[in-house]
Amino acid sequence: MASAHDRAVLQAIFNPTSPIGDVPGLNQEEELMDDDSAFDPELVKQVKDLELQGVSSAESGDLPAALQHFNQAISVLPQRASAYNNRAQTKRLLGDTKGAVEDLEHAISLSNGKGRSACQALVQRGLLLRLSGHDEEARLDFERAAALGSEFARQQAVILNPYAALCNRMLSEVISKLRNPEVSEMQ
């Protein structure tokens, strides 16, 4: 079995653009969860069922039905962040970017920036900010989501960080020279 150091070296060789130390499977943390302990368990179960119905509707292409399920979930338990996050995704798919951002901000606020819903909302908001050309704000959201455990957000934060991009480019060149020393001698 390879050591953590060996896996880190292999990661740097095969994925030179990923952040140094970003080794998939190296940090085997527990999956990020939302804290639902403050809510009535029966209401949480009801809301989760509504959210699953909403996700199922969205996956089958029935976005209006998905939106209706997420609206119902929010009306049952308006203090729970997850349904706002899911509704934001549906609103985005329906072309309502402004409404999506409002729901994402609500999800981040309700979750106190912690847990799975916060992580997902930060990633989604980061993507929307990036699409609208607000790269610095997007990078900040990606960094917060990365701190919560999102590998995708970590990669996006590196891409948007000019210093990290420069370091990764230099590392890629060094690794390329190590792989093909005769090519680098001719240059």
Swiss-Prot record:
What's in the keyword line of the UniProt record? Repeat, TPR repeat
Q: What InterPro entries does the record tag this protein with?
A: TPR-like_helical_dom_sf, TPR_rpt, TTC36
**Matching SMART domains, A to Z?**
TPR (SM00028)
Tell me its family: Belongs to the TTC36 family.
What this protein is called in its record is Tetratricopeptide repeat protein 36
Q: Does the keyword Lyase apply?
A: no
Q: Show the coiled coil region(s).
A: none
Is Ribonucleoprotein one of the keywords? Answer: no
What are the ranges of the TPR repeats? 47-80, 82-114, 119-152
Q: Where are the transmembrane segments?
A: none
Under Pfam families, the record lists: TPR_8 (PF13181)
User: What organism is the protein native to?
Assistant: Danio rerio
Give the SUPFAM superfamilies listed for this entry: TPR-like
Gene Ontology biological process terms, A to Z: cilium assembly; determination of heart left/right asymmetry; otolith morphogenesis; tyrosine metabolic process
